[in-house]
């Protein structure tokens, strides 16, 4: 029995590792995915940034390694060139994007905390992709409002990734749907929100999970009803919903 208890304790420890946002019920299966498919193919700069971010006190905010790999593949499949990222943190998903884009690709990156971005910036610079990034410190909504005032910005983005304040996801969608091109893709992160989207309202959950839960539910409902997009919700990381603009 002691051996089984130790195994269970070890499994719990693995489930809490940095960047582990998988909704898989089996930690062993998630580790298999990481060790078989993700880590062996993870570019060295991304590995370096992942390990650097692991030392940060807010490391659970980072994009998981399997989601980073997924984003990289997606960007290459849609041949993205002009992209946007709302919510950067230390830049793991930003680096995945920058590495996936062609040399003349561009990323407009926005975050309210430049200090976190600067933690990962030396790694991004060493990877030789910093020239693709236009980082703006501050809230994204005012920047988006200015952008949509200029019709020349409409329909110019191939891909937009949102991993920021969940209470503004609806507000972001209202704006960026005008900026992404028809046939382009928007990715919303955390749309399964720690699995809380199917939990009873009185279920025990962390305060931040409970606070943002209704905003995530509101977003999911709105995306499902939006006739301008096709959607696909995937259980990658903490849930990511892809929206392909069709009109």
Swiss-Prot record:
This is Caffeoyl-CoA O-methyltransferase 6. One of its GO terms (molecular function) is caffeoyl-CoA O-methyltransferase activity. It catalyses: (E)-caffeoyl-CoA + S-adenosyl-L-methionine = (E)-feruloyl-CoA + S-adenosyl-L-homocysteine + H(+). Belongs to the class I-like SAM-binding methyltransferase superfamily. Cation-dependent O-methyltransferase family. CCoAMT subfamily. CDD domains: AdoMet_MTases. It is an enzyme of class 2 (transferase). SUPFAM superfamilies: S-adenosyl-L-methionine-dependent methyltransferases. Binds 1 Mg(2+) ion per subunit. A divalent metal cation binds at residues 163, 189-190. The lineage of its organism: Eukaryota, Viridiplantae, Streptophyta, Embryophyta, Tracheophyta. Pathway: Aromatic compound metabolism; phenylpropanoid biosynthesis. Transmembrane segments: none annotated. It comes from Nicotiana tabacum (Common tobacco). Its EC number is 2.1.1.104.
